[in-house]
Amino acid sequence: MPIDHSGTTTNGGLVLSATGSQWRQSARSLLGQLYLMFVSMLLLVVVPGTSAADDRWHPGIYVKIEDWQLRSPAQMETIYEELRNTPQLRGIKVILLWGRYESRDSRGGASRYDFSQLDEILARLGALENKHLIVALAWREFKSAKGASEILPNDLQGGRAWNADPNRAHTQYEYLWAYRMSNQPGKYAYNLKLWHPTILGRLDAFLAALAAHIDQHPNLTQISTTESAIGEPVTSFVEEGGSAQRQYDGQLAVIRAMKKYFVQSDVVPDFNYSREHVAAMVPILQAEGIGLGSSNSNKSKGLILQPPSGAPGVLTYYPRLSGTVILAPEIQGDDYRSTYGHDTPPDHPRYESIYLRVRDELKANYTVMQRNNPYWLGDASTPSMLKFIQSYPAIVNDRTGAGGLNHVKPKSVR
């Protein structure tokens, strides 16, 4: 059930009596109350770790939960058991498919929100020691299987058929409110049309409802997004009714809505491409107290490029922003496979080098590790990342719980 914010607080007042002793007693009581209020305010300013915002500052190592894992009770039980047995893991990151949590009756037109899945996750994390949740809104998805998607609510899923794809049977319909980015079998992809007022208005209402329901929960630490790359639309942006710049503007509108509604939790969106878009966003992140996340931390050319002119890669901003905004580079399958990204030969870097890059070169406060095999659990020829986390001295011996990452709050954290 949504948290009830309708309660009110009353302040007790002094009732002056006719006698001087009662008046003096009341005066002393008032002075005592004022003194306690002053001391409390002073503690909030000068004593580290005493502000309410600290309840949401939980830097460290998190695990990314794939949607197929989220939909499997057996998989989730395994993940909770890993969290229970691994103090070095700070929590999990869950990707929010908008259509799973909002639906509409076409006859009435009113949105219904069902956040029971998140309620269950937060309850399970709350029952564990020092475990927290990051939620990430999916404005982009990749599809390899047939069938409908939950990237959009049910009433926004219908649309005109687009017949140029010879493998069109991969999905039951086309999306009127999402544009396609690929025709390659196994690599179908969609982005929400964030330039459209209908989508932005509905997302604004969804985020308001989501925040009202979970933002006060002490085990929620962040809200994020999927990556900023917008891809190349199969049909041109002009045909679709938008433009690349308007799509990027829509991303910023969604991020600002998160910042508006999630007043307790930190906002750390995911940026990778375009480099020009990232360059335009960095000053805004600094000015508005928004963090910087990235879905990969490898040395792919596009991520680390520092041209003599033009926009640099997103990972070049991390060291210079350390101490200013929250930094959250992630470790995904591409990072396990190759030092230099998905389009280079695999060299399977040592887990220590992957971790040290995130910690020392990128100055991370948070990192999210993809829980994909064989890397996570290991096999006959692949070591286990989970066992690395459970045994690496710099992670195990960090008393702050941050897994060796930078646990000092940046200026942007309230």
What are the residue ranges of the model-derived segments?
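Aromatic-lined carbohydrate-recognition surfaces of secreted/lumenal glycan-active proteins
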Residues: 219-230, 254-277, 295
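An active-site-proximal structural segment forming one wall of the substrate-binding cleft
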Residues: 124-126, 183-224, 250, 254-257
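N-terminal secretory signal peptides that target proteins for export/translocation
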Residues: 1-32
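Aromatic-lined substrate-binding rim segments of carbohydrate-active enzymes
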Residues: 79-89, 94-166, 247-251
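Boundary/entry segment of secreted carbohydrate-active catalytic domains
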Residues: 53-90, 95-97
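Active-site-adjacent "subsite" loops/lids of carbohydrate-active enzymes
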Residues: 118, 140-209
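Bacterial N-terminal signal peptides
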Residues: 33-46
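Substrate-binding cleft of secreted/luminal carbohydrate-active enzymes
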Residues: 296-414
